[in-house]
């Protein structure tokens, strides 16, 4: 979703492994009057992490209704993002991907969406200047309402109920009624995603994303942050660059609007498949629930339904790679998902843990590079660094998050490859979920504003700390 509402771009010749091209393209549009024109081949394969709906007929009715809904994004926007990610894969751009661990229906408000977007824009401005390359901004937003879980049930005080799997599946409250998977929530996810996208489009085109305004926010952060003195030099350099351009009479349109794209984990395959459409330009399939989708660590089985689904759509695809990932697996993902080797099609999002990334990542990068594939390498420094505090809160240490990013950069520097970006769980609010940071959060502070429905997120200050510190790393590359 760009600041210019993503004008259509020419569609490059692409893969031929999708379902057969419809005979009469004039009758099939991106709005999918006939979304069932493709055969959902994933349905014949094992699908991990799917809800157990007690009323299957109700699910079928909801899916049929979703199939009639208009797209949330357009194929041309997905193509545009693929081109931007192609630049990331070739070392010509940097990806900033961030947002909630799991979005919540009751958090779809103007203030919370604005604060999240504001934080990402501030991070992007710092990284753009320091890296001297375009920063592709992608939110974990407008669809991240589902979460895979390690256990299917939860027990409290002798009572066992289904695990909370995100607002798209069931309720957070620990009672039988709330925890029963309800397919009606899929429709609510669609409408909440549409409302969020609408507001983000307004913010990114209506002056809120003006680069000079974003820089002013960063100046305020530097002044108020305990770590501000460390960041002051970089902030001053950005200020001088903007003042020079103003004095020279330069006022490009890119200063006033911003390209911003939406992504989420493609977890609930009934929902994703119902929102898969045939593009009238090309006859190819797109998942129009978001510009980019990724397959998670728990659902990336090569013989599973999620990889099969991802292989049939033309969106940019991400794959989460944990420390157990083998070289053969990585190369097979490329063969399955990017057989034509199109830069920007495939992003490897690495979540190794700070203690493993320096040992586990080099061989993967080395062998994938030697294969001739051009993928974008991105670090997720969050998921491999979670622990439980004595209070029972799941949390992460900011220093561990930073160390995994450092290890990621060190590996790429040693191999002469491009550290393509960061994928972070964050919020624009002043929560107390991760410990550490410049404006330090202590373990004993976690209870004060621990608001996440699932995993701990960096707060606004910690997110901006991370951006300035990653900017320093990029300059050292």
Question: Predicted regions: what is each one?
Answer:
Residues 1-31, 35:
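N-terminal amphipathic/basic-hydrophobic helices that include classical n-h-c signal peptides
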Residues 26-170:
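Long, contiguous, compositionally biased segments that the model treats as domain-scale units
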Residues 102-103, 108-353, 393-396, 404, ...:
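Active-site-facing alpha/beta catalytic cores
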């Amino acid at each position: 979703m760009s600041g210019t509402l993503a004008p259509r771009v020419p569609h490059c010749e692409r893969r031929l492994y999708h379902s057969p091209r419809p005979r009469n393209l004039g009758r099939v549009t991106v709005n999918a009057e006939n979304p069932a024109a493709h055969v959902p081949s994933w349905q014949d394969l094992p699908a991990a992490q799917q809800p157990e709906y007690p009323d299957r007929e109700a699910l079928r009715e909801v899916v049929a209704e979703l199939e009639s809904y208009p797209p949330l994004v357009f194929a041309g926007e997905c193509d545009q993002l693929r081109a931007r990610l192609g630049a990331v894969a070739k070392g010509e751009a940097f990806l900033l991907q961030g947002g909630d661990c799991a979005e919540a229906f009751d958090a779809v408000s103007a203030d919370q969406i604005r604060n999240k977007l504001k934080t990402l824009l501030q991070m992007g401005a710092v990284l753009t200047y320091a890296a001297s390359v375009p920063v592709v901004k992608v939110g974990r937003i407008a669809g991240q309402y589902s979460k895979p879980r390690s256990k299917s049930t939860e027990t409290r005080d002798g009572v066992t109920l289904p695990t909370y799997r995100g607002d798209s599946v069931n309720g957070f409250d620990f009672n039988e009624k709330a925890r029963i998977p309800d397919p009606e929530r899929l429709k609510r996810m669609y409408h909440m995603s549409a409302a969020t996208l609408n507001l983000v489009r307004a913010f990114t085109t209506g002056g809120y994303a003006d680069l000079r305004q974003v820089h002013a926010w960063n100046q305020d952060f530097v002044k108020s942050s305990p770590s501000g003195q460390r960041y002051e030099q970089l902030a001053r350099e950005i200020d001088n660059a903007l003042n020079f351009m103003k004095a020279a009479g330069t006022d490009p349109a890119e200063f006033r609007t911003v390209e911003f794209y939406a992504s989420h984990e493609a977890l609930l395959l009934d929902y994703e498949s119902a929102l898969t459409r045939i593009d009238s330009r090309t006859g190819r399939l797109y998942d129009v629930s978001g510009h980019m989708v990724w397959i998670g660590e728990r659902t990336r089985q090569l013989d599973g339904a999620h990889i099969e689904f991802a292989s049939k759509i033309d969106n940019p695809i991400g794959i989460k790679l944990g420390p157990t990932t083998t070289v053969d697996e990585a190369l097979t993902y490329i063969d399955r998902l990017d057989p034509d080797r199109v830069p920007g099609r495939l992003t490897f999002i690495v979540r190794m843990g700070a203690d493993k990334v320096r040992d586990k990542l080099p061989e993967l990068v080395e062998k994938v590079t030697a294969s001739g594939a051009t993928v974008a390498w991105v670090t997720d420094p969050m998921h491999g660094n979670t622990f439980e505090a004595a209070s029972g809160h799941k949390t992460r240490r900011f220093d561990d998050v930073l160390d995994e990013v450092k290890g990621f950069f060190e590996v790429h520097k040693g191999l002469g490859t491009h550290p393509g970006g960061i994928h972070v769980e964050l919020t624009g609010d002043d929560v107390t979920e991760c410990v550490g940071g410049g404006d330090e959060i202590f373990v004993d502070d976690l209870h004060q504003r621990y608001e996440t429905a699932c995993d701990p997120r960096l707060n606004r200050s910690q997110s901006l700390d991370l951006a300035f510190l990653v900017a320093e790393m990029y300059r050292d590359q």
